[in-house]
Structure formats: structure tokens, C-alpha cells
């Protein structure tokens, strides 16, 4: 399951790994694309939907918190990873942007309770070394 705010690159990541998420607008329903589960970004952005997010995560083996390196804030509250009884990984996207601050994004994910944090540039595609390492970690 890929969890993150709107625009962090969750759907692009799934597409880069060779699985096509459903086309169209981002719905307010959980989407399935191959082995990936994509809950709506609103589940993360609105605390009222945390129960739905936790319930959706019950069927998943691995959760991935996706943080955009260009954002100055994070939607992940401190210690949020401890809410789940699954393996939780962190993923920093958009590290090549001029406004990127991967150290800050790493601090956000560490604050959420993650130890395993990967940085990938989705635009490089599935053949990049970072993307291959991340794919090995989640599968």
C-alpha cells in the first residue's frame, strides 16, 4: 500500500514499476494496480479518514509512506507508523527537483517512525539502481 498526500508521485511510481493504475481522476475509493493498493490521498490528509486508512491497510503486507522532497510540510504525524501492524517503509520522491530537500523529507519520515527510507527518482524509470533496490525491498 502506498500512502501519501496528493501529488507526491504514488500513481507515477506504480506506473514506473510496470503496473498501470486505473486511468482518470483520482477517485475517493481504494484503487488496486497489480500488487499495489492506492488509497485516496484524502485518507492521509484528513484525520477523520484514518480509520478507513487503517482498515484498508489490514490486507497489505508492506506499507510505504511516500514523502515529496519539495514539500515544506508532512501529513504524517509523529509515530504514525506504530499505528500499523505491518512492515512500513519510507520513500522520498522528486529528489532531483531544484526545490528538493531530501534531508528534511527524511526527517519527516523518521519522525513518523520509519527506519528504512529510500530515495527514488521516478522519472528515471524502473531500470535505475534506486528503483530496483526499492522494488526488491517491497516484493
Please place each PLM-identified region on the residue numbering.
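Conserved G1/Walker A P-loop phosphate-binding module
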Residues: 1-39, 44
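Charged, alpha-helix-enriched surfaces in structured cytosolic catalytic cores
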Residues: 8, 12, 48, 100, ...
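Short amphipathic alpha-helical segments
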Residues: 14-15, 76-79, 102-104
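Signal for well-folded cores of large energy- and translation-related assemblies
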Residues: 18, 22, 54, 58, ...
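N-terminal secretory/membrane-targeting helices
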Residues: 19-23, 53, 63-65, 103, ...
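Switch II of P-loop NTPase G domains
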Residues: 36-82, 99
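Conserved beta-strand/loop subsegment of P-loop NTPase cores
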Residues: 60-67, 84-98, 109-121
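Canonical P-loop GTPase G-domain recognition
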Residues: 97-139
Amino acid at each position: 500500500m502506498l500512502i501519501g498526500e496528493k501529488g507526491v508521485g504514488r500513481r507515477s511510481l506504480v506506473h514506473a514499476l510496470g503496473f498501470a493504475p486505473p486511468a482518470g481522476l483520482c477517485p475517493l475509493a481504494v484503487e488496486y494496480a497489480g500488487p499495489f493498493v492506492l488509497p485516496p490521498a484524502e485518507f492521509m490528509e484528513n484525520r477523520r479518514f484514518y480509520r478507513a486508512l487503517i482498515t484498508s491497510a489490514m490486507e497489505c503486507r508492506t506499507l510505504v509512506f511516500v514523502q515529496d522532497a519539495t514539500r515544506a510540510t508532512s501529513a504524517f504525524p509523529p509515530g504514525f507508523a506504530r499505528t500499523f501492524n505491518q512492515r512500513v517503509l519510507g520513500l522520498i520522491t522528486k529528489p532531483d527537483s531544484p526545490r528538493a530537500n531530501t534531508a528534511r523529507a527524511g526527517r519527516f519520515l523518521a519522525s513518523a517512525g520509519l527506519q528504512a527510507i529510500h530515495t527514488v527518482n521516478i522519472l528515471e524509470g524502473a531500470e535505475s539502481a534506486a528503483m530496483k533496490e526499492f522494488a526488491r525491498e517491497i516484493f
